[in-house]
Swiss-Prot record:
It is an enzyme of class 2 (transferase). PANTHER family: 2-ISOPROPYLMALATE SYNTHASE 1, CHLOROPLASTIC-RELATED (PTHR10277:SF9), HOMOCITRATE SYNTHASE-RELATED (PTHR10277). Its cofactor is Mn(2+). Residues 5-266 form the Pyruvate carboxyltransferase domain. The keyword Ion transport does not apply. This is 2-isopropylmalate synthase. Pathway: Amino-acid biosynthesis; L-leucine biosynthesis; L-leucine from 3-methyl-2-oxobutanoate: step 1/4.
Length: 514
């Protein structure tokens, strides 16, 4: 009988901390549904106390996820734990994940607490979390730089208080695999079967996956990871790499296995990339575009003669279908519906109808509509806030010797408003003109153009990060078009709509508190 290592996915919480990876509630719901389809044991849906948006997303995910455990992060503070408990209340299976720093440097300079005070706080946090849920996880932040004697002391104390999972994070990605393995082995010998040991490894030295795997070999039975290795700084351990390493190297891992349906790995990777706008590098293990590509003639010849000559796993094992059907303008609604289900989306009939209309419009302009085109069509709609402003027309004059100018028409409250303006470049002219029409000034922090597919008729996705109020966080806007300028204008208008939606949500939250 297989010994299961639980997969704890934190794409929606830690993964979202990747620069530019911010997601709205509907996007998070789509990813959560796909993670459940993938077979993830625990979905860390967010940090409930962080913002009204995080709280709302966790609550809505808790309402739709049925099989996976839904988890919220919480500092070892009563207000955080209360928010987490309330956010995950609707979940069929729920967990609160509370944490406090345990390294000398963190306790002294960040917490400004003595070790015995930290233990007391941790125990009280676990006890309070138990009043909301049965399943409580406790993390020793910066465990990689903590003293072993203190780690054992605080871990045994929180287990006594009711923690069922103990997470050992390598918060700054400092440990080497043999060090991580030795630490987990010693802790496992101390804890034995009183709690599950989990690891959460960061990739600052490129060792997150190796550290996670060595931990599993030494007693860890939960691994915290993200799709495509997303995460702040250099990212987190990549789920797909951990799972496929365990699956592929049975000579090392023996009866150890996961509950992951590996055929959903590639669809999940593509969905996350489409929603976040962050593509895995081409040579990324397992899910990169070159992972199953063989350019060398010798390699190609070998693979054609026998697949296992140069491939240790099959593309089909991760759900990469090299013979996937490509849709076009003659494709019907039934084929389109089947395709979006295969791509991991869960849409209502009304949403399918709207998506099909956009697909037909795109198919009239493109000979072939790829899977990535369809992903972008749908995720672009999911990413969109309610359309207070809507782009209707765009005309640009980008002559080589003159000053770039743009004429923009925007619809607001049923009326069309047109204005024209100049800028330091075409994009600047478009954005300044939109600012003048709406009366809201934005500051562009980031601008990305993503070629969704290949060829002259490739679909372009533009992602912008804009600050409209220095006292509020930047907002993300997405735009999609064969014309990059139109996609840019749509993205900027989308960011403005997101800003308005965020203001309305904050206002509603304040009204509820009053």
């Amino acid at each position: 009988m297989a010994e299961i290592v639980k997969i704890f996915d934190t794409t929606l919480r830690d993964g979202e901390q990747s620069p530019g990876a911010s997601m709205n509630t509907e996007e998070k719901i789509q990813i959560a549904k796909q993670l459940e389809k993938l077979g993830v044991d625990v979905i860390e849906a967010g940090f409930a106390a962080a913002s009204p948006g995080d709280f709302e997303a966790i609550r809505k995910i808790s309402e739709v996820v049925q099989k996976s455990t839904v988890c919220s992060l919480a500092r070892a503070l009563e207000k955080d734990i209360k928010a987490a408990g309330e956010a995950i209340a609707p979940a069929k299976h729920k967990r609160i994940h509370t944490f406090i720093a345990t390294s000398p440097i963190h306790m002294k300079y960040k917490l400004r607490m003595e070790p015995d005070e930290v233990i007391k706080r941790a125990v009280e946090a676990v006890q309070y979390a138990k009043t909301f849920v049965e399943d409580v996880e406790f993390s020793c932040e910066d465990a990689g730089r903590s003293e072993m004697s203190f780690l054992k002391e605080i871990i045994l104390a929180v287990i006594e208080a009711g923690a069922g999972t103990i997470n050992i994070p390598d918060t700054v990605g400092y440990r080497f695999p043999h060090e991580m393995g030795e630490m987990i082995k010693e802790l496992h010998e101390t804890i034995q079967d009183r709690a599950v040991i989990s690891v959460h490894c960061h990739n600052d030295l490129g060792l997150a996956v190796a550290n996670s795997l060595y931990s599993v070999l030494n007693g860890a039975r939960q691994v915290e990871c993200t799709i495509n290795g997303l995460g702040e700084r250099a990212g987190n351990a990549a789920l797909e790499e951990i799972v496929m390493a365990i699956k592929t190297r049975k000579d090392i891992f023996g009866d150890i296995d996961t509950n992951i349906n590996t055929k959903e790995i590639y669809p999940t990777s593509r969905l996350v990339a489409a929603i976040t706008g962050i593509e895995p590098q081409p040579n990324k293990a397992i899910v990169g575009k070159n992972a199953f590509a063989h350019e060398s003639g010798i390699h190609q010849d070998g693979v054609l003669k026998h697949q296992e000559t140069y491939e240790i796993m099959r593309a089909e094992d991760i759900g990469l279908d090299k013979n996937a059907i490509v849709l076009g303008k003659h494709s019907g609604r039934h084929a389109f519906k089947k395709k979006i289900e295969e791509l991991g989306f869960s849409l209502s009939e009304e949403e399918i109808n709207k998506a099909f209309e956009r697909f037909k419009m795109l198919a009239d302009k493109k000979k072939e509509v790829t899977d990535d085109d369809i992903r972008m069509l749908i995720t672009n709609e999911i990413a969109s806030a309610p359309e207070v402003y809507k782009l209707k027309k765009l005309q640009i004059n980008d002559c080589s010797e003159g000053v770039p100018s743009a004429a923009v028409t925007v619809e607001y409250e049923g009326k069309e408003i047109t204005d024209a303006g100049i800028g330091d470049g075409t994009i600047d002219a478009i954005f300044k003109t939109i600012d003048r029409i709406t009366g809201v000034q934005g500051k562009l922090n980031d601008y990305q153009v993503i070629a969704v597919s290949k060829g002259k008729d490739a679909l372009a996705k533009v992602v912008v990060k804009v600050v409209f109020d220095e006292n509020k966080p930047a907002v993300i806007g997405h735009g999609l078009s064969i014309d990059t300028m139109i996609a840019s204008a749509k993205a900027y208008v989308g960011a403005l709509n997101s800003y308005i939606s965020m203001k309305d949500m904050l206002r509603t939250k304040r009204d509820e508190e009053i």
